[in-house]
Regions:
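N-terminal [4Fe-4S]-dependent radical SAM core
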Residues: 1-17, 27, 222-294
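Flexible, glycine-rich loop/tail regions that form catalytic "lids" or insertion modules at the edges
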Residues: 12, 20-24, 65-66, 191-194, ...
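Conserved SAM/AdoMet-binding glycine-rich loop
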Residues: 22-24, 38, 52-53, 57-58, ...
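N-terminal pre-triad scaffold of radical SAM enzymes
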Residues: 23-29, 282-309, 342
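Glycine-rich beta-alpha loop elements in corrinoid/cobalamin-binding modules
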Residues: 35, 54-244, 252, 256, ...
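Terminal amphipathic helices with adjacent charged low-complexity linkers/tails
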Residues: 59, 187-233, 246, 255-258, ...
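Flexible glycine/acidic-rich beta-alpha junction loops that bind and position SAM and/or redox cofactors
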Residues: 82-91, 140-142, 172-177, 201-202, ...
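Conserved, mostly hydrophobic/aromatic
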Residues: 164, 266, 301, 326, ...
C-alpha cells in the first residue's frame, strides 16, 4: 500500500487528522531509493498518520490545502536532487526533461523548491505546525554557502525559507526523535542532525565567521567552510553556530550512522516500488526504470573527492546491510511484475566499499588530517572484498535471478589495495556481473588537476585497465570500460583537457563521451576553490574557468571526435576470434552518398 497522497486514501483509512504532511519536488515513487518514501514509511511504521503532497502547484492553494494542517509538522524536501541541479545545466540553461517527474517534462518543480514550498505553506496557513526542512537540497545548504546560480554567498536555507527546523543527513532516526519530542511538547535542541535558529549563540559550540563576514571576505568564507568541513564526523564533530543577520544558526553535531540492524530495518519496509497512481494520467517516471529492480547494499563514502557532496549528506562512514537482508530483497524482486531476471544494480555510492570499514574510524572517528584514499589508500583501512564476493555468489544462486549487475562505480585503487580478494573480486564481477560495460570514474589524467579533485593518479587506472582486458578475454565476452570525466574543474585549463583527450585515446583506447562540466554545488571543497580561486591546502592562486564559453570549450575539447572511432566512441574489448586481435576499432557509420563531395 502506498503512503496516502489523495484525500480519498485518507478517507478510506478512516483518518480525520494527519500528524505529518510531507512535501516533495518529485513525483511520488514508493521506493527505498527515494528519501521522502523512506521518511514517510519510517513514521508510518511507528504509528504516525502521514501523507505526501508531490510537486504542489505553487501558484495556488489547490494542492497544499488538500489535507488541511498537520498536528505535528510539515516536512519539506526539494526531491532526490537539488532543485537547481535538477532544473538547470552547468551552463545555466533550463533542462527540458526530468527523470523524477511523471511524463518526463521539467515543468513541475520550481527553482529553490525548498524555499518555494515553505513559503507556500506560510502563505496558506498563517499560524501552523512547525515547518521542517530535509533532503539533499536542505542538507547541503544548511550553513552560509556559495550559490553558483546567483553567484553570491547565501544564508542558511533555514533562514531564507523562514522554517522552524532543518534535519540534515539521511535522518531516518532523527525524524522519529523529532516527531516524538514535538508530540510531547519536549525540547528538541539537543537532537543530533538538527539545525535551528536562536537569539543567542549556544555555549560550548564552535562559532563560525558570520554570514556578513563570509560575504565580505573570501578568506573569512574559507575559514568558515573549512571549520564546517572538519566537523562532519558524528564521533568527533563539535556543534557549530553562525550569526546570520540578527539571529544565530545553531548546527548540532551529526546524527550517528545507522547500525547494520537499522539499515536492514529501513530497507525491509514494505515499499511498493512503483509510482503512485495519482500520476498515472501524466505518464511514466523514468527514474523508476532504473531503481525499481536495483538494490542498495550500503551508504556513505570515504572517497574524499573534493567535488562530491555524498559525504556531506550521507556521511563518510560506510553503513552496510547484512547479506541476509540483501538476499531477501533480491528474492522479493523476483515476484514483481515486469521483472525479467536481471537486477540492474547491486551497490551504493561506490560499489566496492561494501563489507569493510576502518576500525580506527569506527572507534575514534574519522581522521581530520588525512584522507582514507588520497593520495593513496590508508594502511589503516585494510580493504577486504571477501564479503562482496560472497554476496554476489549468493545472489547468482537465487531462483529467478539470471544476473545481478554491479552498475555502481568501482574504485580501482581500493580494489587493487586488497591483495587477497581484490583481483578475485574483479574477475568475478567481469565474468558474471557486468552488463556490457563497467563504470569507473577517473575524472581526469593530469596530476595537478587530480590533486585539486582529491583523486589518485593514473597508475591504478592503467593497472585496472590491463586486468579488465585480461579478465574480459578470459570470460570470452564483448564488454568495455565506461569512464566518467569532469571538465572545467578548478585548476583545469584547456591544455589539461587536450592532454586528457590524448590519454583517453592512447592509453584507454576510447573516445570520451561521458563528460560533465563541473557544477559548483554547495558544501564541497571544489566549490570552495571555485569561489575563492585558491587551493585551500596551500593558499596559492588557481586558474578557475568561470565563463560559460570557456567551460563549454573545455568539454568540447574532450569530446571532439578522433579518427578511427565510430558510433559509441570506443575501441571494443572482444575475445580472440580466428586469429584476429581481440582489440578492434568499431568502424564509423558509412557516409551517405548525398554528403560526398561532387566530382
Amino acid at each position: 500500500m502506498f503512503i496516502p497522497a489523495t484525500a480519498d486514501e485518507i478517507r478510506k483509512l478512516g483518518w480525520t487528522k494527519l500528524d505529518v504532511i510531507l512535501i516533495t519536488g518529485d513525483s511520488y515513487i514508493d521506493s527505498p531509493f527515494v528519501g521522502v518514501s523512506v521518511i514517510g514509511r519510517r513514521l508510518l511504521a511507528v504509528g504516525y498518520r502521514v501523507a505526501i503532497i508531490p510537486q504542489p502547484d505553487i501558484a495556488s492553494g489547490r494542492d497544499i490545502t488538500r489535507f488541511g494542517e498537520p498536528e505535528l509538522f510539515w516536512g519539506v524536501t526539494g526531491g532526490c536532487i537539488d532543485s537547481l541541479v535538477a532544473n538547470r545545466t552547468a551552463s545555466g540553461k533550463r533542462r527540458r526533461k526530468d527523470d523524477f517527474t511523471a511524463g518526463g517534462i521539467n515543468n513541475r518543480r520550481p527553482d529553490r523548491a525548498v524555499i518555494a514550498y515553505a513559503n507556500l505553506i506560510r502563505r496558506h496557513f498563517k499560524e501552523t505546525a512547525p515547518v521542517v526542512l530535509g533532503g539533499i537540497e536542505a542538507s547541503l545548504r544548511r550553513i552560509a554557502h556559495y550559490d553558483f546560480w546567483s553567484n553570491r554567498i547565501r544564508r542558511s536555507i533555514l533562514t531564507d525559507a523562514k522554517a522552524d527546523f532543518l534535519l540534515y543527513g539521511m535522518a531516518e532516526n532523527s525524524i522519529l526523535h523529532l516527531a516524538a519530542n514535538l508530540r510531547e511538547n519536549g525540547d528538541v535542541s539537543e537532537l543530533r542532525g538538527l539545525c535551528y535558529a536562536a537569539a543567542t549563540p549556544r555555549p560550548g559550540f564552535l562559532e563560525l565567521p558570520s554570514w556578513e563576514e563570509s560575504t565580505a571576505d573570501p578568506a573569512a568564507f574559507e575559514k568558515m567552510f573549512l571549520a564546517f568541513h572538519r566537523n562532519q564526523d558524528s564521533r568527533t564533530a563539535r556543534g557549530l553556530c553562525q550569526k546570520q543577520d540578527s539571529r544565530w544558526l545553531i548546527h548540532n553535531p551529526p546524527a550517528h550512522p545507522l547500525t547494520q540492524a537499522e539499515m536492514d530495518e529501513v530497507h525491509g519496509m514494505d515499499f511498493v516500488r512503483a509510482v503512485h497512481p495519482c500520476h498515472q494520467s501524466a505518464g511514466g517516471v523514468r527514474a523508476l526504470e532504473t531503481i525499481r529492480f536495483s538494490i542498495v547494499t550500503h551508504r556513505g563514502c570515504y572517497g574524499g573527492c573534493h567535488f562530491c557532496a555524498i559525504a556531506a549528506h550521507e556521511g563518510q562512514t560506510v553503513s552496510m546491510r547484512s547479506e541476509a537482508s540483501i538476499v531477501r530483497e533480491a528474492a522479493c524482486l523476483t515476484s514483481l511484475s515486469g521483472f525479467k531476471g536481471r537486477i540492474l544494480d547491486v551497490g551504493g555510492p561506490t560499489a566496492n566499499m561494501y563489507g569493510f570499514e576502518c576500525k580506527k574510524k569506527l572507534q575514534r572517528g574519522a581522521c581530520t588530517n588525512r584522507s582514507c584514499l588520497y593520495p593513496a589508500v590508508c594502511k589503516n583501512l585494510r580493504p577486504d572484498h571477501g564479503l562482496l564476493i560472497a554476496l554476489l555468489r549468493k545472489l547468482r544462486k537465487l531462483p529467478g535471478i539470471k544476473q545481478a549487475v554491479v552498475a555502481s562505480g568501482i574504485r580501482p585503487d581500493l580494489l587493487l589495495a586488497d591483495r587477497k580478494n581484490g583481483i578475485p573480486c574483479l574477475r568475478e564481477i567481469i565474468r558474471h556481473h557486468v552488463s556490457g560495460q563497467m563504470k569507473i570514474a577517473p575524472e581526469h589524467s593530469e596530476q595537478k588537476v587530480l590533486r585539486c579533485m582529491g583523486k589518485p593518479g593514473t597508475q591504478s587506472l592503467l593497472s585496472f585497465r590491463d586486468l579488465f582486458r585480461k579478465f574480459t578475454e578470459e570470460a570470452g565476452k564483448e564488454q568495455f570500460l565506461t569512464c566518467y570525466w569532469i571538465a572545467a574543474h578548478p585548476g583545469c585549463e584547456q591544455a589539461d583537457m587536450e592532454a586528457l583527450r590524448r590519454f583517453a585515446v592512447r592509453e584507454l583506447a576510447l573516445q570520451p563521451e561521458q563528460v560533465q562540466i563541473f557544477t559548483p554545488t554547495p558544501s564541497t571543497l571544489s566549490t570552495l576553490m571555485y569561489y575563492t580561486g585558491r587551493d585551500f591546502r596551500t593558499g596559492k592562486r588557481l586558474f578557475v574557468e568561470k565563463t560559460a564559453a570557456g567551460r563549454e570549450l573545455q568539454k568540447k575539447i574532450l569530446v571532439a571526435k578522433t579518427p578511427g572511432f565510430g558510433y559509441g566512441g570506443r575501441i571494443r574489448q572482444t575475445p580472440k576470434r580466428e586469429g584476429k586481435s581481440w582489440e578492434k576499432t568499431r568502424m564509423s557509420k558509412r557516409i551517405p552518398r548525398k554528403n560526398l563531395p561532387k566530382r
